[in-house]
Amino acid sequence: MNRSHHQHRYAHRLRTSAAAGISLLEVVVSIAVLSLLLSLVAPAILSMRDRSQALECRNRLRQLGVAAQERLATTGKFPKTSIPGQFDTTAGNASVAYISTSPFRELIASLDSNTADMIFQNEGDWGRDLAATLGHPFPPHDLGKQKIPVLICPSETQPQARLSYRANLGSAPSVHRSGMSQQDRLHSVGAFSNGFAITPAQFKDGMSNTVLFSERISGDFDANRYSPFRDSFRGQGNMMQVDAAMEICKTQAVVTPDHPDSEAGKDWLLGGWLSSWYNHVAGPNSTVPDCASLHDFGGGDALLSARSLHAGFVNAGFADGSVKSVADEIAIDVWRAMGTREAIDSQSE
């Protein structure tokens, strides 16, 4: 009797266990449902991350604007993009009139006091080293390669990047005004000017209408590959006029262009088109690749556009300290007007 009873209970457990088990079909269905949910949720998570990074990118650009306003309150001028050259004829060295530097050199005291101390302790040696290299500025101790978080947009994916923001040198390709058309001369007057510190009175269009800094992603840091959106190259021909610069950079951007440079953003202390300057010749995130006439030097003519990894826009900091997102689809005449401190009617172009 007891044995029969135990056998009955055992058989009941087996039937219950079989009924409670999961079939192969149920496993497949469950995996399919989970995959579907993941495919729906993952883009939302990525989108949230992208928005968060873009917001922090704006915040860091705003900090740069605050630092520029502090500099303005202290000196009455915005930072320079170059310092006087050093003249040393005793050793037969050639001299340079200006040494291209980043405006962040003068803002760093408000952003990172420790790095600022290092810069100004070595100022004398730095100037002599710069002059000796004839416009190839490489500060000692790799100061410009010090990683300062506020200078790097969180969206940047290259670990070597040290600078995600650049100074607006105007809406014309050249930093020199001789030989330009009248319209291009007006466009060349950016928030920053090579060799001069700009005062508020020089913003004829108003500081709230002129971009001070904008984003520019780094190069791909791969010397064996040319990435048109990230990298730049040396353009062949006269690039002083806007239309000519657009045509040269567009047509000469072949698979292996002349002197491609993949190290944009490697240093926040250097000046020049390859390091910390940009212009409004082409629109934000332009499909026209960047190029410059004097690719190894700070000055010369260039098309160097604002570029970001955000979907459809770049962040721009204005001279009054405000920060705005500017869509890729902005009319080019409006974008160029935002790049100059001259009072230009964007509808007249």
Residue ranges and their predicted role:
Residues 18-56, 63-64:
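N-terminal single-pass transmembrane signal-anchor helix
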Residues 3, 9, 15, 32, ...:
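Intrinsically disordered, low-complexity segments enriched in polar/charged residues with Gly/Pro
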Residues 12, 22, 32, 36, ...:
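Intrinsic-disorder/low-complexity peptide segments enriched for small residues
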Residues 1-22, 88-89:
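N-terminal leader/signal peptides at the extreme start of proteins
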Residues 44-349:
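Internal low-complexity, small-residue/proline-rich segments
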